[in-house]
Amino acid sequence: MTHAAPSDLDSASAGDLAEAVRTRRVSAVALCDAAIARIERLDEPINAVVVRDFDRAREQARACDARIAEGDTAGALLGVPMTVKESYNVAGLPTTWGIAAFRDFVPTEDAVLVRRLKAAGAILLGKTNVPPSLGDWQSANPVHGVTVNPHDPTRTPGGSSGGGAAALAAGMVPLELGSDIGGSIRVPAHFCGVFGHKPSFDLLPSRGHAPPGTDGAGIDLAVCGPMARRAGDLDLALGVLAGPDGDEANGYRLDLPAPRVPTIDGLRVLLLDTHPSARADAPTREALHLLAGDLVREGARIERSSALLTELAGVHRAYVQMLMTITTYGAPGGREVISAHDWFNLVQRRAKVRREWRALFAAFDVVLAPVFGTAAFPLTDEPVWSKRSLLLDGEPSAFGDQLAWSGMATFAGLPATAAPIAKSPEGLPIGVQIIGAFLHDRTTIALARQIEALRAG
């Protein structure tokens, strides 16, 4: 077995790393040590991996190598070094959700998804930075400080899974476990030029991913999901992470459908580059148009409007009301309260919207849209969203309006994959959001892989 990690593995996919360990081309200890060395060398100016667990990671890696020596090479993520978002419970490590009042909370057991990663052979190096209560498109908090974008340290890496996206973009790790309710996987992936997947609602169990001090109930709209530097690793991780938990596991088994179309040829695409509630700047729209041209040349059928599309402005209003109610619950300093009748009205509206999306996805395989209306914006100390604004094509635009792009998929519980497709005039990554029908997660990830291959070619 090779004990030094070959340099070509520094940028390899998680799947390739697991295969290298499985075939004894490299040891798990060597991969672990190499990843730790990259974090120690690269992370000081970025501040992505804010809770480090290197000693236990090395123990996990040694145990992995010992198991392989005995002939046990099971595990889709065998020996793969990775990180998880700070908000996931890992036994023995603090979980603060970026809130100083929770600084001393140390869980005694792992989140269910952390257990699944470990069972698949992953080596957990530590936890990555988040904003307070996971409620910003930046990743800065009073416990762990500010994370910056590896492409430009004056700009945000996104949030709330911004530390994970920064670690991926800087080449520290190949894989990260994030979460998403307001674009918290997709926006950091877009800002940092990596891949992220927001799964269909409830596809991945959330036990062990809840604010300290709550009873651990699942959070409506919120999902857990993977982020990666290679698109194929999203599918690899999904296979490890997805599936029922607890009592549901007694009666249910997951069987996700295969991608609707195995290649781009014949793919039915609805392209949305405008939204009644949010703007996208010219570089973002141009990147989408160039991608559409590439897909057409590969045989895709692109349409730019459809009578089947749900009424997006109303969806945005309902989503924001539901989101604000959910995300302020349990947070120190108060909450937004609505009546039970108002909540049930939102639930009814969502049921109608889900039916409308179902009808649309009978005519289309995927919807392509911006992840966010611009590339990564400059870091700001202003905590109040209503006092922030973005510059889109030189004109100010309300900051919170950008929730409209992520809310299209989130409100209806649809899968959405973010994939890098271009660079802005400033050299910053621009991504595309690939939205699919409910439980057709493999379709959106498959298109992300095909786009990655097109861009590599």
Region spans (language model):
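Conserved hydrophobic/aromatic pocket- or pore-lining residues that grip, position, or stack substrates
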Residues: 35, 57, 79, 85, ...
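An N-terminal boundary/leader segment
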Residues: 1-59, 297-299, 457
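Short glycine/serine-rich loop/turn segments
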Residues: 77-224, 272-274, 371-393
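Short helix-loop capping/hinge segments that flank enzyme active sites or metal/cofactor-binding pockets
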Residues: 5, 77-97, 263-272, 301-303, ...
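Short, well-ordered beta-strand elements within core beta-sheets of diverse protein domains
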Residues: 16-23, 102-105, 222-229, 334-335, ...
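Acyltransferase
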Residues: 28-33, 62-65, 282-306, 343-364
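N-terminal, positively charged, Ser/Thr/Ala/Gly-biased leader segments
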Residues: 25, 29-33, 40-102
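Structural helix-boundary/capping segments
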Residues: 41, 119, 170-270, 275, ...
